[in-house]
């Protein structure tokens, strides 16, 4: 069968598999690609291909992540799977693989386990908006009542972390049985094999339940300032990469962060020495600003659609602290620790005032390799919003990564 040309006609969604070690995340990922490949909608990927995930660096942190892509009738998916638990934690906190939704894999034979809980909590903290559940290893459970019991447990657990546990689709099946059927068959269509059909059913639920995300260009405009120039006779130009939205010549934008928020008008948009009518998400541009002096702007400020983002100094965050062998600190740190927080394009000094463990208790100190919730107070207000990522640095070296889970003031 000739491989069809990849047309970007379908909406694109990023998803990932999450759940406890050995509950079958990678096997399921392989089963999804194999079953959709049988319909000509994916390239089949074997378990070993996915498990040998390449190393990536994101915000100074090394993470192993496997990326696969496939299509359903309605959508194109990019799917991320991590081999180790630590990779999941780092991946979700750094946002290396942004997820619009996740497939939570729970072994029907074991029920929810500690990492099941931890991944659900992480999904909540880092803003993964939707979860669909796959109850795996159904072939190992003869008792229908036991299946129902595990399903109830999973729904309760999701409710505990403010996901709509009663409404979330749960599909049971066996990724391994599906893979074996697919490996042994020359061709496969819906209705040929009950185990493969359960994988198709899962993808139908993912299609229906996980909404298509708003595209970056449709969000309110935001560009973090990287550099500032003064052009004689023309004015001040701020350069940077547009993070989201679009900006049109003549539009009013706000300059937010470090100092008082002020408005200015964009009188020109330039890219690669050419003038444009508008810049959009992903473009590296220079914006010519009316009535602003070069000294009024500095790196670390953002230009944004008026009213869309505000400056803050205090927030709660979910953080991963690097281990010594990852290039992190060698020693623990305590409340009162003052590192730099690298947000978008700049370092801002801040004080860490409190640590909270998963169970809500206060932690006395943080060790390299820990994941912890911490309260941070910055010395300068900067444009912050929930779900925003940052790195924690000490003398230019990354010692941790975090995501804003709640703005305090």
Curated annotation (Swiss-Prot):
E.C. designation(s): 3.6.5.3
Pfam families noted in UniProt: GTP_EFTU (PF00009), GTP_EFTU_D2 (PF03144), GTP_EFTU_D3 (PF03143)
Domain tr-type G span(s) in chain numbering: 10-214
Region (G5) residue spans: 174-176
Keywords noted in UniProt: Cytoplasm, Elongation factor, GTP-binding, Hydrolase, Magnesium, Metal-binding, Nucleotide-binding, Protein biosynthesis
GO CC annotation: cytosol
Catalytic reaction annotation: GTP + H2O = GDP + phosphate + H(+)
Residue ranges, annotated region (G4): 136-139
Segments of this protein annotated with the region G1: 19-26
Family the entry assigns: Belongs to the TRAFAC class translation factor GTPase superfamily. Classic translation factor GTPase family. EF-Tu/EF-1A subfamily.
Known function: GTP hydrolase that promotes the GTP-dependent binding of aminoacyl-tRNA to the A-site of ribosomes during protein biosynthesis.
Name of the protein described by the UniProt record: Elongation factor Tu
């Amino acid at each position: 069968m000739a491989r069809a040309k990849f047309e970007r006609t379908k909406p694109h969604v990023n998803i990932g598999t999450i759940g406890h070690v050995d509950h079958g995340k990678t096997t399921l990922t392989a089963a999804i690609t194999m079953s959709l490949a049988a319909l000509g909608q994916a390239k089949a990927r074997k378990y070993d291909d996915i498990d040998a995930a390449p190393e990536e660096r994101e915000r100074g942190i090394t993470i192993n992540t496997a990326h696969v892509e496939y299509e359903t009738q309605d959508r194109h998916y990019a799917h991320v799977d991590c081999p180790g638990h630590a990779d999941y934690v780092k991946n979700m906190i750094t946002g290396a693989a942004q997820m619009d939704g996740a497939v939570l894999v729970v072994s029907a034979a074991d029920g929810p386990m500690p990492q099941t809980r931890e991944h659900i909590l992480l999904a909540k903290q880092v803003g993964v908006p939707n979860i669909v559940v796959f109850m795996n290893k159904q072939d190992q459970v003869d008792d229908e009542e036991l299946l129902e019991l595990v399903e109830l447990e999973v729904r309760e657990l999701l409710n505990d972390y403010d996901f709509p546990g009663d409404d979330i689709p749960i599909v049971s099946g066996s990724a391994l049985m599906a893979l074996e059927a697919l490996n042994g068959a020359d061709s496969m269509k819906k209705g040929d094999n009950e185990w493969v059909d359960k994988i198709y059913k899962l993808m139908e639920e993912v299609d229906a339940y996980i909404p298509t995300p708003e595209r970056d260009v449709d969000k309110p405009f935001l560009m973090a300032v990287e550099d500032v120039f003064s052009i004689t006779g023309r004015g001040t130009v701020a350069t940077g990469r547009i993070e989201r939205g679009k900006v049109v010549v003549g539009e009013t934008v706000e300059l937010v962060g470090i100092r008082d928020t002020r408005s200015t008008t964009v009188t020109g948009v330039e890219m690669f020495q050419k003038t444009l009518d508008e810049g959009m998400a992903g473009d590296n541009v220079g914006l010519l600003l009316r009535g602003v002096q070069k000294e009024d702007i500095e790196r670390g400020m953002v230009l944004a659609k008026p009213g869309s983002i505000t400056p803050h100094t205090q927030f709660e965050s979910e953080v991963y602290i690097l281990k010594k062998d990852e290039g992190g600190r060698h020693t623990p740190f305590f409340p009162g620790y003052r590192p730099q927080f690298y947000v978008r394009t700049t370092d801002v000094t801040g004080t860490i005032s409190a640590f909270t463990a998963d169970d809500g208790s206060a932690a006395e100190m943080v060790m390299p390799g820990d994941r912890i919730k911490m309260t941070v107070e910055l010395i300068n207000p900067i444009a912050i919003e929930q779900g925003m990522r940052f790195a924690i640095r000490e003398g230019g070296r990354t010692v941790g990564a975090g995501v804003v889970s709640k703005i305090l003031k």
